[in-house]
């Protein structure tokens, strides 16, 4: 379903996004 698609996308995206956000904090 849509939620499972979003969760799978989040699992791929978050590992790349979190370090970038952390650098700017």
UniProtKB/Swiss-Prot annotation:
<keyword id="KW-0964">Secreted</keyword>
<keyword id="KW-0929">Antimicrobial</keyword>
<keyword id="KW-0027">Amidation</keyword>
<dbReference type="Pfam" id="PF07440">
    <property type="entry name" value="Caerin_1"/>
</dbReference>
<dbReference type="GO" id="GO:0042742">
    <property type="term" value="P:defense response to bacterium"/>
</dbReference>
<comment type="similarity">
    <text>Belongs to the frog skin active peptide (FSAP) family. Caerin subfamily.</text>
</comment>
<keyword id="KW-0878">Amphibian defense peptide</keyword>
<keyword id="KW-0044">Antibiotic</keyword>
<feature type="modified residue" description="Leucine amide">
    <location>
        <position position="25"/>
    </location>
</feature>
<dbReference type="GO" id="GO:0005576">
    <property type="term" value="C:extracellular region"/>
</dbReference>
<protein>
    <recommendedName>
        <fullName>Caerin-1.4</fullName>
    </recommendedName>
</protein>
<dbReference type="InterPro" id="IPR010000">
    <property type="entry name" value="Caerin_1"/>
</dbReference>
<comment type="function">
    <text>Antibacterial peptide, that adopts an alpha helical conformation which can disrupt bacterial membranes. Each caerin displays a different antimicrobial specificity.</text>
</comment>
